């Protein structure tokens, strides 16, 4: 693939991405032999898999929050395959941050990539937003954890001693 063909493909991928046609992006990139794709097309392929996993073509997943775990894990594997080239690339860190957040519901892991993205592109409002979102998820997780501990403590205090001696309510 020469430079003009690659530029044309990249433009077409952007158009399909804007139209939520992620499967078309995947088919077009996967039609190119893996050893000829290079870094940028591998990252674009990962983006297409990630978007398909989370949004579906033409938003078919809607807002149900359901994520195709196999597709999102494949997106991460693709990013891992070009980690050496991507670690200092804001775009690679962005894709890894979003994918990890969706794959594992892990704001901790996603936040690491988001902060790296922000360090590499401090003026990028999307990087700033992902860091804020991850930090909010982490705070919500801590609050939920505390809430569960508080509830458990209340239940222990309110459970009569004879029930405790029998080993609990459900025995």
Language-model-detected regions and their locations in the chain:
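Amphipathic alpha-helical repeat scaffolds of TPR domains
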Residues: 2-11, 35-61, 87-102, 125-137, ...
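Amphipathic alpha-helical repeat elements characteristic of tetratricopeptide repeat
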Residues: 3-7, 23, 69, 73, ...
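TPR/TPR-like (Sel1-like) alpha-helical repeat modules
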Residues: 64-76, 107-126, 132-139, 146-158
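Solenoid-repeat scaffolds in large eukaryotic assemblies
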Residues: 24-25, 58, 110, 143-147
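Short coil/linker segments at helix-helix boundaries
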Residues: 50-81, 101-102, 109-110
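Canonical positions in the second alpha-helix
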Residues: 31-32, 81-82, 116-117
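Short helix-adjacent coil turns
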Residues: 20-24, 105, 122
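N-terminal leader/linker segments that initiate helical-solenoid repeat arrays
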Residues: 1-25
């Amino acid at each position: 693939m020469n430079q003009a063909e690659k530029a044309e493909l990249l433009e077409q991928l952007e158009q399909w991405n804007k139209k939520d046609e992620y499967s078309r992006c995947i088919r077009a990139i996967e039609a190119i032999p893996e050893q000829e794709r290079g870094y940028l097309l591998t990252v674009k392929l990962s983006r297409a898999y990630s978007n398909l996993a989370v949004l579906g073509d033409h938003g078919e997943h809607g807002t149900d929050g359901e994520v195709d775990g196999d597709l999102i894990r494949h997106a991460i594997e693709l990013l891992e395959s070009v980690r050496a080239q991507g670690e200092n690339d804001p775009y690679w860190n962005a894709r890894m941050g979003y994918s990890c957040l969706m794959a594992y519901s892990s704001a901790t892991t996603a936040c690491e990539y988001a902060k790296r993205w922000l360090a590499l592109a401090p003026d990028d409002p999307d990087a700033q937003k992902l860091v804020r979102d991850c930090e909010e998820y982490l705070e919500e997780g801590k609050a939920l954890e505390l809430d569960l501990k508080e509830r458990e403590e209340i239940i222990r205090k309110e459970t009569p001693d004879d029930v405790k001696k029998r080993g609990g309510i459900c025995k």
